[in-house]
Regions:
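Acidic, surface-exposed loops and disordered segments
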Residues: 1-222
């Protein structure tokens, strides 16, 4: 499965079977985490076989069950976009390995001793990880023209990027982002106003999807 195929196959999953993740798959995820942390200067950590973080659901949105593995998405205060970008890179790897995921902003507890924080670091969110009880369902799709600006008929490569971005997970499915095509191949991605927050993390996620669909070599970020 390619990353683009993983984008199309991935859906947020909140109910898990509890089936242990094979050590070979965990090692691949650990290797990717190490690469992402090194490249981005963030502090993603994998927690395995720990059920307490999701043992109670006090929020109405997104009740979880069976979660025993998750990624702690930690970094400095200004790391939000990188958290989204590199976190989604790991999410798509997990999808290619036959695993399911869900980005989680609120519906979890921080369990002491399961992760560490360096000075000035914080936990931005977590990502549930494991074998889903289902494969999830596609979130409602909004018209693509709401998510970009371009004076004229946009090129095919740009629209392929937009369609991939629309498949990205965002906080409460808010999709508060817009892509602007300037000149021939310069693209600006910007977050929009949101009461739910997490827009910078969402921006990193959708930018990664956009890059996978278009190819980083075919455009530059403005």
């Amino acid at each position: 499965m390619t990353e683009l195929e993983a984008i199309k196959a991935r859906h947020s999953v909140r109910k898990y079977t509890g089936q242990p993740i094979e050590e070979s798959k965990l090692n691949l995820i650990r290797e990717e985490i190490q690469k992402c942390n090194s490249e981005a200067g963030i502090h993603i950590q994998l927690v395995v076989d720990e059920p307490k973080a999701f043992s109670t659901g006090v929020f109405k949105y997104g009740v979880f069950s069976g979660v025993r593995n998750y990624l702690v998405m930690a970094g400095n205060k200004d790391a939000e976009e990188r958290i989204g970008y590199y976190g989604e890179r790991i999410v798509l790897l997990a999808q290619t390995l036959g695993l399911n995921t869900c980005w989680v902003g609120l519906t979890y507890k921080k369990i002491p001793g399961t992760f560490t924080l360096e000075e000035k670091e914080k936990v931005h969110c977590v990502i549930a990880l494991g074998y889903g009880a289902t494969q999830g369902v596609q979130h409602p799709m909004k018209p693509s023209e709401k998510f970009y600006e371009y004076d004229g008929v946009p090129p095919t490569w740009f629209m392929e990027g937009i369609e991939a971005a629309l498949l990205a997970p965002t906080a409460v499915n808010q999709q508060k982002f817009k892509f602007i095509l300037r000149d021939e191949n310069k693209v600006q991605a910007k977050p929009l106003m949101s009461l739910a927050g997490y827009t910078q993390i969402d921006l990193g996620i959708v930018k990664y999807h956009f890059e996978i669909a278009t190819g980083k070599e075919n455009f530059s970020w403005d």
